[in-house]
From Swiss-Prot:
Core subunit of the mitochondrial membrane respiratory chain NADH dehydrogenase (Complex I) which catalyzes electron transfer from NADH through the respiratory chain, using ubiquinone as an electron acceptor. Part of the enzyme membrane arm which is embedded in the lipid bilayer and involved in proton translocation. One of its GO terms (cellular component) is respiratory chain complex I. Its main location: mitochondrion. It comes from Artibeus jamaicensis. This is NADH-ubiquinone oxidoreductase chain 4L. The gene is MT-ND4L.
Length: 98
C-alpha cells in the first residue's frame, strides 16, 4: 500500500470517527461527510489513474456531483433548522413538520 493510499485511508477514517464522535451538531456532521467524500474522490481518482481504466474515468465526476447535491441539501436543512430553532442540534431534526 503506497503512502498516498494510506494517507487517504487515514483521512477517511478520521472523518468517519469525527462523524461518530461529533454527531450532536449538524455542522460538524456535514464537515465530516465532506471530508469523507473528498478522500473517496482522491482515492478513486488515483486508483483510476494508476490502473489506466479509461472507461471508469467518469466515476470521480459522478461522485463530485453527488457530493455537491449532498452538501446543498445539508446546508439548506442546516439553515432551516437554525432559523427555526436557533441551534444546529441533530435532535431537532425529529421536530421538523413539513
Amino acid at each position: 500500500m503506497s503512502l498516498t493510499y494510506m494517507n487517504m485511508f487515514m483521512a477517511f477514517t478520521i472523518s468517519l470517527l469525527g462523524l461518530l464522535m461529533y454527531r450532536s451538531h449538524m455542522m460538524s456532521s456535514l464537515l465530516c461527510l465532506e471530508g469523507m467524500m473528498l478522500s473517496l474522490f482522491v482515492m478513486m481518482t488515483i486508483t483510476i489513474l494508476n490502473t489506466h481504466l479509461t472507461l471508469a474515468s467518469m466515476l470521480p465526476i459522478i461522485l463530485l456531483v453527488f457530493a455537491a447535491c449532498e452538501a446543498a441539501l445539508g446546508l439548506s436543512l442546516l439553515v432551516m433548522v437554525s432559523t427555526t430553532y436557533g441551534m444546529d442540534y441533530v435532535q431537532n431534526l425529529n421536530l421538523l413538520q413539513c
